[in-house]
Design a protein with these regions (language model features):
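Alpha-helical transmembrane segments within multi-pass membrane transporters and channels
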Residues: 1-3, 63-68
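Interfacial loop/helix-cap signal at membrane boundaries in integral membrane proteins
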Residues: 9-17, 111-126
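Juxtamembrane helix-capping/reentrant segments at transmembrane boundaries
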Residues: 6-24, 79-86, 284
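Select subsegments of transmembrane alpha-helices in polytopic membrane proteins
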Residues: 21-33, 84-93, 289-299
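Membrane interface segments of multi-pass transport proteins and intramembrane proteases
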Residues: 72-82, 116-124, 288
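Membrane-interfacial loop-to-helix junctions in multi-pass inner-membrane proteins
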Residues: 22, 47-55, 74-89
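Alpha-helical transmembrane segments and their helix-start/interface "positive-inside/aromatic belt" motifs
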Residues: 81-92, 152-158
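Alpha-helical transmembrane segments
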Residues: 5-9, 34-63, 97-114, 129-134, ...
């Protein structure tokens, strides 16, 4: 149980650092989801299978996050849904999406193949393991974004940067000419995701106006869980799954830092980092919150640009 073990490694110092935030309203992610869904319904082809899948993912994880936040707010001293419960529903979603995409893609030449950055001629066919990969990316990214949501503006800012990158990638893979020139898989209908990702960016920027330091509202799990799931499924649909490790590098590092912290603590009873996720480690070293956030933004932007460059390499 990663989250519960992680909480045991936290210290009172973290509570002191964030003591002034205890009265800031949360569940602002509801507004993000509403903005994304309304924009998508207005401007996208809602009968497009990929649009339906990303909307389904957003709503499923949004409901899961809503109940988690609601329990935290209404039941004192509660940490919300158990980690096992959340993981069960996340895996359930991943399985459903994975099976749908597997049967949708299996008759398409590039359908269940994995595109390897830098090696455009190497595209191993995952076969039935494709379903497990889909589950891994949706569950992993959902939790990674959730773990990153610990500093004012950090998670939503990195999400906006990732959304911008996927907007361009979705447009490219949805066009025969561009995808042929760059030698990336052409995915008919995936161009609609560029509109969806644009809605994600717009909603994210609107929320960031109120979430940047000092935050006037937090997104809560109702925002972070679906945003992570969206990034995961978009990467899968546009057949650039491994690019998520560049585009979402901050999220990946945050999640890995927690896993390492837990594993090392269980084995040695000592902390690898002063506190996990890693953004708290830098806070403990004396970095101001805004400096941590801005430096993470810079890294996220550089890695997103690098991911776009790989399309031409």
């Amino acid at each position: 149980n990663v989250s519960e073990d992680t909480s045991k490694t936290d210290s009172e110092t973290l509570k002191d650092l964030h003591s002034e935030k205890k009265n800031v309203p949360t569940m602002g992610g509801i507004i993000i989801l509403i903005a994304i869904i309304v924009s998508t319904v207005l401007w996208c082809d809602i009968f497009n299978i990929y649009i339906l899948l990303v909307l389904f993912t957003a709503i499923w994880l949004g409901i899961l996050g809503f109940f988690d936040d609601y329990i935290k707010l209404t039941q004192k001293h509660s940490s919300g849904l158990t980690s096992g419960s959340k993981l069960f529903f996340q895996c359930g979603l991943g399985l459903i999406i994975g099976l749908i995409l597997y049967f949708h893609f299996k008759d398409i030449e590039e359908g269940t193949r994995l595109v390897i950055p830098f090696f455009k001629g190497v595209r191993p066919d995952l076969g039935a393991f494709y379903v497990l990969m889909v589950m891994f990316f949706i569950v992993g990214m959902s939790n990674a974004v959730n773990l990153t949501d610990g500093l004012d503006g950090l998670s939503i800012g990195c999400t906006v940067i990732a959304g911008m990158a996927f907007t361009l990638i979705a447009y490219i893979v949805g066009r025969v000419d561009f995808s042929s020139y760059l030698q990336v898989p052409y995915i008919a209908g995936a161009g609609e995701l560029s509109i969806f990702c644009s809605a994600l960016v717009g909603a994210g920027l609107g929320f960031m106006w109120f979430n940047c330091f000092p935050a006037q509202t937090f997104m809560g799990d109702v925002g972070s869980l679906p945003l992570g799931g969206i990034l995961g499924i978009v990467a899968i649909i546009v057949k650039q799954e491994l690019l998520i490790f560049f585009i979402g590098s901050i999220f990946i590092v945050e999640a890995v830092s927690v896993l390492l912290q837990v594993c090392v603590f269980k084995i040695t009873r000592k902390r690898l980092f002063l506190c996990a996720p890693i953004h708290h480690h830098f806070q403990f070293k004396g970095w101001p919150e805004t400096k941590v956030t801005m430096r993470f933004f810079i890294i996220a932007a550089i890695m997103a640009l690098f991911s776009l460059i790989t399309l031409k390499l």
